[in-house]
């Protein structure tokens, strides 16, 4: 919803923005930060395949759609990694596969969906068209028709230096000197990125792993974050907001009376 909120004037007269995201790999009472990109660019890919179906005893009379689908699923990620700089971290992974209703019938339609993620925003912009081309090229030898829905998602969240420093200082004041941990750039996507295309800001990882708890992944069904993290997140966000307001007040006072400020 970030794009729609920005279009409706959310960031009008807003000098900076802050956000948090739960992280089950960071301990309760700590936050994860980094200057620069903290998330990745992310797109959604939907592929609708069609071809002549038929009996599994005579695949040569069909386009053998499921075999074609399997080749697209395997070859598209592999080809993209060869056509982009490996350091850009292009990743295509599939989350949905659907085709067929019977074990002895080759279907005439199939569906494949997933995401493309990229650490580097410039490569992300280039890889979009490249992805569509590769899908078409892989599908052609099998005779299937591939209709691609490539939904451009979000760029990386890029934390600015000043705002990240504000946030870290607020967290240290609230939680202690050892409360800050450096986190790696995540392959996840976050639409807060669009806000930081408009104003400077920073997003941090809120630790939710209680002492003795196993490490979960965000989308695991049994992930149960510690509820104590809620209060910690509120404290850090409130303290950060107050620091940001004081910074703006000090800047305004300096601008209003530069001579007096220089005399000090």
Feature names for model-found ranges:
Residues 67-264:
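Metal-dependent amide/peptide-bond hydrolase catalytic core
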Residues 1-107, 189-190:
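Histidine/acidic-residue-rich, glycine-tolerant segments that coordinate divalent metal ions
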């Amino acid at each position: 919803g970030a794009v729609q909120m920005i279009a409706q004037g959310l960031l009008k007269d807003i000098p900076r923005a802050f956000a948090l995201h739960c992280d089950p790999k960071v301990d309760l009472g700590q936050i994860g930060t980094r200057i620069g990109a903290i998330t990745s660019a992310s797109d959604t890919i939907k592929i609708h395949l069609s071809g002549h179906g038929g009996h599994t005893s005579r695949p040569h009379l069909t386009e053998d759609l499921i075999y074609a689908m399997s080749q697209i699923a395997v070859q598209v990620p592999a080809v993209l990694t060869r056509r982009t700089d490996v350091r850009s971290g292009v990743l295509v992974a599939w989350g949905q596969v659907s085709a067929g209703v019977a074990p002895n019938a080759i279907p005439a339609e199939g569906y494949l969906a997933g995401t493309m993620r990229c650490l580097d925003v410039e490569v992300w912009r280039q890889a979009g068209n490249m992805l569509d081309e590769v899908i078409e090229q892989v599908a052609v030898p099998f005779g299937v028709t591939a209709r691609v829905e490539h939904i451009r998602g979000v760029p990386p969240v890029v934390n600015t230096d000043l705002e990240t420093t504000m946030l870290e200082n607020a967290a240290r004041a609230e939680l202690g000197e050892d409360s800050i941990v450096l986190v790696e750039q995540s392959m996840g996507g976050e639409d807060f990125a669009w806000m930081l295309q408009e104003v400077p800001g920073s997003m941090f990882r809120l630790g939710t792993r209680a002492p003795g708890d196993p490490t979960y992944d965000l989308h695991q069904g049994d992930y149960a974050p510690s509820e104590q993290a809620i209060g910690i997140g509120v404290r850090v966000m409130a303290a950060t907001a107050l620091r940001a307001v004081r910074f703006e007040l000090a800047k305004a006072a300096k601008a209003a009376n530069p001579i007096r400020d220089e005399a000090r």
